[in-house]
Amino acid sequence: TLSIPLRQAIHDTLAADKQAILLLNRRGNSRALVCVDCRKAPECPRCSERLTYHSANNRLLCHYCGYSVPVPDRCPSCGGPLKTLGTGTQRVQQELSALFPDVGVARMDADTVSASNPHEVILDRFRRGEQKILLGTQMVAKGLDMPNVTLVGVLDADLSLFTGGFRAGETTFDMLTQVVGRAGRGSFAGRAILQTMVPNHELIRLAAQQDYDRFYDLEIRLRQVQHVPPFADQVLIGFQGLQEPQVLMGAVKFRDSLLQLQRSGDFGPMELLGPAPSPVPKINYQFRYRLTLRCRMEKNIRAALRYLLCAFGKDSKMRGVSAFIDVNGFMD
């Protein structure tokens, strides 16, 4: 998990009696169990997502609906043996403890932060020097001012680049520049090491250099080509319900109605994509589809969408299907 350069940098930092912050660029533990034989992973029965493995309580958890179950002894599908897949903070902590057995490692993630162990307590222990390494997920990326921290390491620095959505580059650059800025905030020089599978990616290099101006030039040109904000509005029209054929039919009807209004009115340039399954196609037994509309949200477009949404709600054939609109938002 930890590259040789990062291991050496941690060793040098500890030898100088300084501290290090390590960020795992994933939500929570981001680990799954996978069957060695059939390669299937246990999935949430309510959603279309694989369950995340939490070794602290030896349970599988769905981060969308909250479904939780003890880890099975064997694969639920074929009875084969299960193994963990992915890198979690718990595994990185174990690796750090094995490499540096005499050094305390503070871990700050969804499993360790609680009412009885709030993040303030974890950070206070680290600030006092009781622990020399702070390991966490994105909650350690911002707002920390620790003068004795001279090293920051980011594992899977590129992971959030490939999560989809027009903001992926922006959010990745923001996260990386924030965490890089945690090193060397006192009178000691700091350094940062980004572990990535794409070291030549322009965004990764600019984040390491904290070069916002060049990143902006790169990102704004890309968004203009993609016809996404700020050059156009991106409207996600979502549909969800218990019966998948009905949900899909509702999305198709809404699309056809919108295209008919477009032909009869003056809407200006408009790109309509879908319907397609949402990135998470099912949550809590609800099937999810969406349309993607790229246009300028002018008055006539807003009026048309309000009209279609109202008509959809009154359609008796669509009873049980809900529709909603998200403009330039974060809906998945």
Predicted regions and their residues:
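Short, conserved catalytic or adaptor-binding loops enriched in Gly and charged residues
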Residues: 97-99, 263-265, 313-317
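Core structural elements
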Residues: 275-282, 332
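Short beta-strand elements
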Residues: 262-278, 319-327
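Acidic, two-metal ion nucleic-acid-processing modules in DNA metabolism proteins
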Residues: 255, 290, 295
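Short amphipathic alpha-helices in soluble, non-transmembrane regions
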Residues: 250-257, 303-311
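Inter-lobe coupling/hinge segments of SF2-like helicase ATPases
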Residues: 1-248, 260, 279-281, 290-291, ...
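Generic C-terminus detector
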Residues: 306, 310-332
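Nucleotide-binding motor/catalytic cores of P-loop/tubulin-like NTPases across gene-expression machines
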Residues: 265-269, 282-287, 299, 312
